[in-house]
C-alpha cells in the first residue's frame, strides 16, 4: 500500500506541474489569433455542458465496435511513433485462492500514444479508442490514442487542453490503480508520467465528447443505455458466465461501429474548439488540484495507517515464522521422540509377548496339574464318602444296639422292682404265716442251720463275685480314661488317614470290649438274681420247715431271716450301685463316641486344609499341627483331676454308706458326733457374742479417753 500511495503522490505532483505549464501556455495562446470560428464556439458550448454532466461509462459492446473501427483506420494510416505508458494494475490479494478471484482483478494495460509527424501534414486526424472489457466482473482498461495534426499550433492546443481536462480522470485512475501496484513499478520515469497525464487529459475530453454523442443516440438506440447500465451492474457484481458476455459483445460490435464513426467525427470538431475553452479549463484545473490535494492528504493518512498495519502484519508474520520454526523443531523433536517411543514400545511388546507366552505355558501346566489334582480329589472324596457311610452305618447300629440294651435293662429293672415289691408283700404275709408256723420251725433247725451255712458260703461267694465285678468296673473305668487320654492325644497331635483308620478300629474294638464286659456284668447280675430267687425259695422252704420248730428256733430263724433280709437289701443296693455304674459307663461311652466324632470332624477339616494347601503348594512339606496352648492343656489336666476327685468322692460316699448300713453302732455314733459338733458350735457362737458385747463398750470408752487432751 505504501508503494501505491507513493506512486499516487508522484502522479499528483506531475499533474500540478503540467497544470501550471498548461496555464502559462494558454495565456500565450490567447494572444495569438484563433483560426477556428463559430464551429469552435459551438463545440466549446457543448463541452461545457458535457463537463457539467460528468464522464460517461461506455458499454462493452460499443467499446468492442470502436476497437474494430480503430484497427481499420490504423491499417490505413501511415506508421507513427508510439509511446507506451504502463498503467497501474491492482495486484490480486494474498488471501484469494480461486481462479475466479484472480481473474476478476483488472490487469495492467498499456496505452499507445502516437506522436506527431516531423514533416507535418495539412490535416490532423485524431482517433480515440476506449476499450473497457469486463472479465468476470473485473474492469480492464486499454486506451489507445492516435493524434495527427496538420498544423503545429492546433496540435499543441489540443494536447494542452486534453492534459488539463483529463487531470480529474487521472486522479480516479490513480485511486483505482493505487491499491494494487506492485513494488517493482513504484518509481516510473518522469517522461512516462508526463505522457500518462497527457493521455489521461485526452481521455477525459474524449469521454465528454462521447457523452454528448451518447445523449444524441439515446433516442435512436435505447439498447446502448440499457447495456451501459447492465455493464455498471456487472462491474459491481461478478457475472457467473463469461461466455454470455462474449456473445453480447460480438452482437453489439456490428451495431456500434457506425455510431462510433459519427461520434469520432463530432469529437474531432470538438477538439478543434478546445483552445477557446482554456479559461474554463483553468478553473476546472484549480478545482481538480484542490480535490487532488485533499485526496493526497487522505491518502497520506491512509498510507500511515496502512504502514502501521503493514508493520504490524510484518511483525505478526515474523512472529508466525518464528512460531512456525519452533513448531517445526518441536515436530522434528516429537517425531524423534515418537520413533524412540515406537522402538521402545516394540521392545516392550516383544518382551511382553515373551512373558505372555511363558505365562501361557505355565498356565497350561498348572491347568494340567489342577485337572490331575481334581481327579485325585474326586477319588479321595469318593473314598471319604464311602468311609463316612460305613461309619454312619456302624454308629447307627451301635447306637441302636445300646438303646435296645438300655431298654432291656430298664425293663429288667422294672421287673425286678415289681418282683421286689411282690416279695415284700409276700414276706409280710409269710411273716404272719411264720408266726403261726413257728412251732413247726423248731423241727427244721438242723436243716436250717445247714442251709444257713450253705447260704453263708454262697453269700461269701457272691461277695467275692461282687468284688470281682468291682475290679472289672475299675478296669473298665481305667480303659475309658485311657480312651479319653488317647482322644486328647489325637486332638493334640496331627494324625494321618492310616493312623486315623487304625485308631477308629481300636476304638471300635474297645467299644466292643466294653459291650462284652457290660453283657458279662448283666449275665452275672442275672445269675445273682437267680441265686437270690433260689435263696428266697429256700427261705420259704425254711420258713415252712420252721413252723414246726419251737419258739427258740423261731427266734433264731427270725434273726437269720433278718440277716438274710439285710443281705437281700445289701445285694439290692449292690445291684443299684451296679446300675448306676452301668449308667455312668454308658454316659462315658457316649462321651467317648462324641469325642470320636469330633476327632473325625477335625481330621476331615485338616484333610481339606491339607488338600487345599497341596493343590497350590505341592512341593511344600506337610506342617505338623501346633499343640494346644498352655492354658488349654492345664484346663484339660484340671478336668481330668476333677473327674478323678469326683469319682473318688463317689466311691468314698458309697463305701461309707455301705459301712453305716452294715454297722448300726457306727450310725448311732455318727449321729451323736454330729449332734455334739452342732452343740459345740452353738456354744462357741454364744460365747463369742457375749465376749463381743462385753468388749464393745470398753473399747469405745478407751477410744473416747484417748481423744481427750
Swiss-Prot record:
Organism: Oryza sativa subsp. japonica
Skewed-composition ranges (Low complexity): 29-43, 94-113, 162-180
Coiled-coil annotated spans: 287-592
Side of membrane Lumenal, spans: 685-707
Alphabetical GO biological process terms: Golgi organization; retrograde transport, vesicle recycling within Golgi
Positions on the Cytoplasmic side per record topology: 1-664
UniProt KW keywords: Coiled coil, Golgi apparatus, Membrane, Signal-anchor, Transmembrane, Transmembrane helix
Membrane-topology annotation of the record: Single-pass type II membrane protein
Domain of life according to the entry: Eukaryota
Keyword DNA repair: no
A GO CC annotation given for this chain: Golgi cisterna
Positions of transmembrane segments: 665-684
Task of the protein: May be involved in maintaining Golgi structure and in intra-Golgi transport.
Subcellular locations according to the entry: Golgi apparatus membrane
Protein's name according to its UniProt entry: Golgin-84
Basic and acidic residues: compositionally biased ranges: 78-89, 114-132, 211-222, 248-265
Amino acid at each position: 500500500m505504501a508503494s501505491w500511495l507513493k506512486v499516487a503522490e508522484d502522479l499528483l505532483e506531475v499533474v500540478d506541474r503540467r497544470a501550471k505549464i498548461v496555464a502559462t501556455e494558454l495565456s500565450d495562446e490567447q494572444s495569438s489569433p484563433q483560426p477556428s470560428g463559430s464551429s469552435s464556439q459551438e463545440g466549446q458550448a457543448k463541452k461545457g455542458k458535457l463537463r457539467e454532466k460528468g464522464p460517461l461509462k461506455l458499454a462493452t459492446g460499443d467499446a468492442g465496435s470502436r476497437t474494430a473501427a480503430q484497427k481499420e483506420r490504423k491499417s490505413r494510416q501511415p506508421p507513427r511513433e508510439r509511446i507506451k505508458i504502463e498503467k497501474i494494475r491492482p495486484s490480486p490479494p494474498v488471501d484469494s485462492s480461486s481462479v475466479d478471484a484472480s481473474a476478476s482483478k483488472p490487469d495492467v494495460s498499456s496505452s499507445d500514444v502516437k506522436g506527431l509527424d516531423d514533416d507535418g501534414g495539412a490535416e490532423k486526424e485524431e482517433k480515440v479508442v476506449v476499450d473497457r472489457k469486463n472479465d468476470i466482473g473485473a474492469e480492464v482498461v486499454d486506451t489507445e490514442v492516435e493524434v495527427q495534426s496538420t498544423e503545429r499550433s492546433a496540435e499543441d492546443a489540443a494536447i494542452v487542453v486534453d492534459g488539463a481536462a483529463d487531470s480529474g480522470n487521472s486522479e480516479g485512475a490513480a485511486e483505482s490503480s493505487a491499491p494494487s501496484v506492485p513494488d517493482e513499478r513504484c518509481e516510473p520515469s518522469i517522461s512516462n508520467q508526463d505522457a500518462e497525464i497527457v493521455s489521461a487529459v485526452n481521455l477525459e475530453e474524449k469521454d465528454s465528447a462521447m457523452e454528448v454523442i451518447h445523449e444524441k443516440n439515446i433516442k435512436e438506440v435505447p439498447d446502448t443505455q440499457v447495456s451501459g447500465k447492465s455493464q455498471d451492474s456487472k462491474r459491481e457484481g461478478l457475472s457467473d458466465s463469461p461466455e454470455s458476455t462474449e456473445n453480447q459483445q460480438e452482437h453489439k460490435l456490428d451495431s456500434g461501429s457506425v455510431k462510433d464513426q459519427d461520434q469520432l467525427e463530432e469529437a474531432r470538431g470538438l477538439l478543434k474548439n478546445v483552445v477557446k475553452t482554456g479559461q474554463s479549463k483553468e478553473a476546472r484545473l484549480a478545482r481538480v488540484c484542490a480535490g487532488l490535494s485533499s485526496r493526497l492528504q487522505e491518502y497520506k493518512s491512509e498510507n500511515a495507517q496502512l504502514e502501521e498495519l503493514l508493520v504490524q502484519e510484518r511483525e505478526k508474520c515474523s512472529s508466525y515464522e518464528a512460531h512456525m520454526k519452533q513448531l517445526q523443531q518441536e515436530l522434528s523433536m516429537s517425531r524423534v521422540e515418537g520413533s524412540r517411543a515406537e522402538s521402545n514400545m516394540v521392545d516392550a511388546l516383544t518382551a511382553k509377548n515373551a512373558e505372555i507366552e511363558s505365562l501361557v505355558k505355565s498356565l497350561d501346566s498348572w491347568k494340567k496339574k489342577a485337572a490331575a489334582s481334581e481327579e485325585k480329589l474326586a477319588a479321595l472324596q469318593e473314598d471319604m464318602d464311602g468311609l463316612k457311610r460305613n461309619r454312619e452305618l456302624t454308629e447307627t447300629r451301635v447306637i441302636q444296639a445300646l438303646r435296645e440294651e438300655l431298654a432291656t435293662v430298664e425293663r429288667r429293672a422294672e421287673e425286678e422292682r415289681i418282683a421286689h415289691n411282690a416279695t415284700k408283700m409276700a414276706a409280710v404275709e409269710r411273716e404272719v404265716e411264720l408266726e403261726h408256723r413257728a412251732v413247726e420251725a423248731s423241727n427244721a433247725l438242723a436243716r436250717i442251720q445247714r442251709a444257713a451255712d450253705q447260704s453263708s458260703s454262697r453269700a461269701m461267694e457272691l461277695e467275692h463275685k461282687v468284688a470281682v465285678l468291682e475290679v472289672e468296673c475299675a478296669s473298665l473305668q481305667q480303659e475309658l480314661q485311657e480312651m479319653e487320654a488317647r482322644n486328647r492325644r489325637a486332638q493334640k497331635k496331627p494324625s494321618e488317614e492310616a493312623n486315623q483308620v487304625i485308631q477308629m478300629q481300636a476304638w471300635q474294638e474297645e467299644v466292643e470290649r466294653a459291650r462284652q464286659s457290660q453283657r458279662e456284668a448283666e449275665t452275672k447280675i442275672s445269675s445273682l438274681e437267680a441265686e437270690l430267687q433260689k435263696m428266697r425259695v429256700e427261705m420259704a422252704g425254711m420258713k415252712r420247715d420252721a413252723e414246726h420248730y419251737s419258739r427258740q428256733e423261731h427266734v433264731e430263724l427270725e434273726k437269720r431271716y433278718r440277716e438274710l433280709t439285710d443281705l437281700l437289701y445289701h445285694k439290692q443296693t449292690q445291684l443299684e450301685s451296679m446300675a448306676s455304674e452301668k449308667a455312668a459307663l454308658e454316659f462315658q461311652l457316649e462321651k467317648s463316641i462324641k469325642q470320636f466324632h469330633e476327632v473325625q470332624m477335625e481330621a476331615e477339616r485338616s484333610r481339606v486344609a491339607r488338600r487345599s494347601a497341596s493343590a497350590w503348594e505341592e512341593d511344600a512339606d506337610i506342617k505338623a499341627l501346633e499343640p494346644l496352648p498352655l492354658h488349654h492343656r492345664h484346663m484339660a489336666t484340671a478336668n481330668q483331676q476333677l473327674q478323678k476327685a469326683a469319682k473318688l468322692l463317689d466311691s468314698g460316699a458309697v463305701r461309707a454308706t455301705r459301712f453305716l448300713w452294715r454297722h448300726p453302732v457306727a450310725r448311732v455314733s455318727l449321729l451323736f458326733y454330729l449332734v455334739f459338733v452342732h452343740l459345740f458350735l452353738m456354744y462357741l457362737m454364744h460365747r463369742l457374742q457375749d465376749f463381743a458385747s462385753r468388749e464393745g463398750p470398753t473399747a469405745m470408752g478407751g477410744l473416747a479417753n484417748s481423744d481427750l487432751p
